[in-house]
């Protein structure tokens, strides 16, 4: 089984992807973890590394290559904004593609709590990072992140608590046509 979960920062992708991986005994692979690790290796914060990646498309290409190779092995929850796009572009049809969304203010609040920073700082960083990513994805892949047509399920995670979102996703998985 191959499941992709994507969404903008602060929508709950990591939380739910971990829970789904555990429940269904799947591996959890997160593009964001790979990206953060690469930023750390280069001694940059996420905003700096995002800007750097705009000029160095090999960063995104390496993340994508790793995701596709892992997906080919199956039994995985791939978490990342481009996970579904990358698999489809490489001829791999996931069993379920999911996109999480939530209002900007809600996401900023979640990020401020998670990273223990001021909400306004979180909002500013989030807006900068998203603008950088949108630009990169359009230039490198010709992907518009606002195009949600490839997703089987789009969930506004501000409408339910974590358990509610988990139940919705679990129900979708349990009811997939065999």
UniProtKB/Swiss-Prot annotation:
Reactions this protein catalyses: CMP + ATP = CDP + ADP; dCMP + ATP = dCDP + ADP
Protein residues bound to ATP: 7-15
Taxon lineage: Archaea, Methanobacteriati, Methanobacteriota, Methanomada group, Methanococci
Major subcellular site: cytoplasm
Native species: Methanocaldococcus jannaschii (strain ATCC 43067 / DSM 2661 / JAL-1 / JCM 10045 / NBRC 100440) (Methanococcus jannaschii)
Entry's family note: Belongs to the cytidylate kinase family. Type 2 subfamily.
Name of the protein described by the UniProt record: Cytidylate kinase
A GO cellular component entry from the record: cytoplasm
Keywords from the named record: ATP-binding, Cytoplasm, Kinase, Nucleotide-binding, Transferase
CDD domains noted in UniProt: CMPK (cd02020)
Gene that encodes it: cmk
Subcellular location: Cytoplasm
Molecular function GO labels: ATP binding; CMP kinase activity; dCMP kinase activity
Pfam family, one: Cytidylate_kin2
């Amino acid at each position: 089984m191959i499941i992709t979960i994507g969404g903008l920062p602060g929508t709950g992708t990591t939380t739910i992807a971990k829970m789904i991986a555990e429940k269904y005994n799947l591996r959890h692979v997160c593009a964001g973890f790979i990206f953060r690790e690469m930023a750390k290796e280069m001694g940059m914060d996420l905003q700096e590394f995002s800007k750097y990646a705009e000029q160095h498309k090999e960063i995104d290409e390496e993340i994508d290559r790793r995701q596709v190779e892992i997906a080919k092995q199956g039994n995985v929850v791939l978490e990342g904004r481009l996970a579904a796009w990358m698999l489809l572009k490489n001829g791999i049809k996931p069993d379920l593609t999911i996109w999480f969304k939530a209002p900007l203010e809600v996401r900023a609040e979640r990020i401020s709590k998670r990273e223990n920073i001021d909400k306004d700082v979180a909002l500013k960083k989030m807006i900068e990072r998203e603008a950088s990513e949108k630009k990169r994805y359009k230039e490198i892949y010709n992907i518009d992140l606002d195009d949600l047509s490839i997703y089987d399920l789009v969930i506004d995670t501000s409408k339910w608590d974590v358990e509610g979102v988990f139940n919705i996703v679990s129900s979708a998985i349990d009811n997939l046509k065999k």
